[in-house]
Amino acid sequence: MVNSNMLKKKIDDSGMKIKYVAVQIGLTPAGFYKKINNESEFKVSEVVAITRVLGLSSNERDEIFFGSGVA
C-alpha cells in the first residue's frame, strides 16, 4: 500500500498538480487517483517514474511506497 498522504504532500510541495504528474508517468488522472487511493497498485515502472518526476530520494521513495506505516 502507498502512503497516500505523504505522496500527495510531496506532489503539493513540488508545485505540480496531480493531473500533471499522472500524465508525466503515463497514466490518466483517474488511473493515478485510483493508485494514490490504494484502489489499484503502482507498477515498478510507475514508482521509478514518480521518483524521477518528483525528485524523490531513495529514502522518500521507500517510505512512500514500501514503508510499514502507509496510510
Spans of features found by a protein language model:
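Short acidic alpha-helix initiation/capping motifs at coil-to-helix transition points
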Residues: 1, 40-44
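A short, Lys/Arg-rich alpha-helix, primarily the initiator
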Residues: 1-17
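Residues within the helices of the helix-turn-helix
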Residues: 8, 19, 30, 48
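Short, charged recognition helix plus adjacent turn
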Residues: 10, 14-15, 23, 34, ...
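Residues that mark the N-terminal boundary/hinge immediately upstream of a DNA-recognition element
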Residues: 17, 43-46
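Recognition helix of helix-turn-helix/homeodomain-like DNA-binding domains
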Residues: 27-41
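DNA major-groove recognition helix of helix-turn-helix/homeodomain DNA-binding modules
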Residues: 45-60
